[in-house]
């Protein structure tokens, strides 16, 4: 498959945000144990939902496979580009967007590291229970694998703490599911 690099550069503009061919670091092509291998044609670092949407729209229209990636701990092999295409690295989308203490919710981007989220809420006297073995994993990765860890028996797993998501579908459509609304008990 031949990617239109000029189209990708219009979507993912800026220094050190789009890599192709031999410029893609080798750690992006296999799992952490070196058992699963793949090969992508491009590696993109979006900074916004709009860029993710535009990139997925391009990939959908041109039938290019996309492999999303968070922190890349890759302990389950899910971020290896087995079908080639584009690696969509969300690690630079790593901000807290909102903390709502009334609803006890925090809205973060998918690349936020678990250890950073835990430190953020703990500094405010709050607690985020899911605690998988890899502290440098991303929240997006935790959601995609429903990570739990040693606290799961007492507190549950990641899905138990997700109230809503902003998702970008494979065709680039942006969708809001759930939310942080509190519903009174009657």
Identify the residue ranges that each predicted region occupies.
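N-terminal flexible segment immediately upstream of the FAD-binding catalytic core
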Residues: 1-60, 73-104, 155
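FAD-binding subdomain of flavoenzyme oxidoreductases
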Residues: 95-99, 107-186
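Short, ordered loop/turn segments at secondary-structure junctions
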Residues: 70-73, 133
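Residue-level detector of anion-binding/catalytic polar loops
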Residues: 64-65, 127
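Conserved phosphate-binding and hydrolysis motifs of nucleotide-dependent enzymes
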Residues: 48, 70, 141
């Amino acid at each position: 498959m031949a990617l239109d690099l000029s189209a990708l550069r219009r979507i993912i503009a800026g220094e050190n945000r789009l890599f192709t061919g031999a410029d893609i670091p080798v750690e992006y092509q296999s799992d952490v144990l070196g058992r699963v291998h793949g090969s992508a044609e491009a590696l993109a670092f979006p900074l916004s939902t709009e860029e993710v949407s535009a990139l997925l729209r391009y990939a959908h229209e041109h039938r290019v496979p996309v492999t999303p990636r968070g922190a890349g701990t890759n302990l389950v092999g899910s971020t290896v580009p087995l079908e080639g295409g584009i690696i969509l690295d969300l690690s630079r989308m790593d901000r807290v967007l909102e903390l709502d203490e009334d609803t006890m919710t925090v809205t973060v981007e998918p690349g936020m590291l678990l250890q950073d989220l835990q430190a953020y809420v703990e500094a405010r006297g709050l607690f985020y229970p899911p605690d998988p073995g890899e502290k440098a994993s991303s929240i997006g990765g935790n959601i995609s694998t429903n990570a739990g860890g040693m606290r799961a028996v007492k507190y549950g797993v990641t899905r138990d703490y997700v109230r809503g998501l902003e998702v970008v579908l494979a065709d680039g459509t942006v969708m809001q599911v759930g939310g942080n609304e509190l519903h009174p008990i009657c």
